[in-house]
Amino acid sequence: MNKPIYFSKFLVTEQVFYKSKYTYALVNLKPIVPGHVLIVPLRTTVLNLSDLTMPESQDYFKTLQLIHRFIKWQYKADSINVAIQDGPEAGQSVPHLHTHIIPRYKINNVGDLIYDKLDHWDGNGTLTDWQGRRDEYLGVGGRQARKNNSTSATVDGDELSQGPNVLKPDSQRKVRALTEMKKEAEDLQARLEEFVSSDPGLTQWL
């Protein structure tokens, strides 16, 4: 991973824990829950899913399946959300294609509240026309325009219990330090190598 890696205009090399020929996986600046990671094409001009070439597309979804399996194993998740917000009107917050992988659990399941959180996930990307469409989406048609900002994560009106995998309210989701993200990326890289070596069948996804 010597060559600089960018997420839109942002240098994210030290957040990357896996890289294939056309794709990479990185830890999150403001994860919704522990284990919330992103799959991103290396080519920064890929704004939408349809912008991928055939080789890029094959590599992208192969990487997605590998990291999906790994995150479920690593974080002992019962289920996984796989989310692509394809364009600003769909809630995409950074003008570079990316797929969210988010662990989910039987206990403290927040249901569809996770999608509200995705609407406010922000990597601070900007392109003039693209950002204008994003602002319009948030102002008149965004999910949050239809609901009030939540101060605590609830399900059916009941406040969720505390725990490491509980979805945090936006006020508690702070931008993480680079050193913290670098350490997490290094740990996940080591664990991913262990995961792949534990099952010879997984090498086909590399």
UniProtKB/Swiss-Prot annotation:
List locations, semicolon-separated.
Cytoplasm; Nucleus; Mitochondrion
Provide the GO biological process annotations: nucleoside catabolic process
Mind telling me what this protein is named?
Answer: Bis(5'-adenosyl)-triphosphatase
- Organism name: Saccharomyces cerevisiae (strain ATCC 204508 / S288c)
- The EC designation for this entry is 3.6.1.29
Q: Where is this region: Disordered?
A: 143-164
The alphabetical list of record keywords is: Cytoplasm, Hydrolase, Mitochondrion, Nucleotide-binding, Nucleus
GO molecular function annotations of the record: bis(5'-adenosyl)-triphosphatase activity; bis(5'-nucleosyl)-tetraphosphatase (asymmetrical) activity; hydrolase activity; nucleotide binding; ribonucleoside triphosphate phosphatase activity
Annotated active site residues, numbered on this chain, are 98 (tele-amp-histidine intermediate)
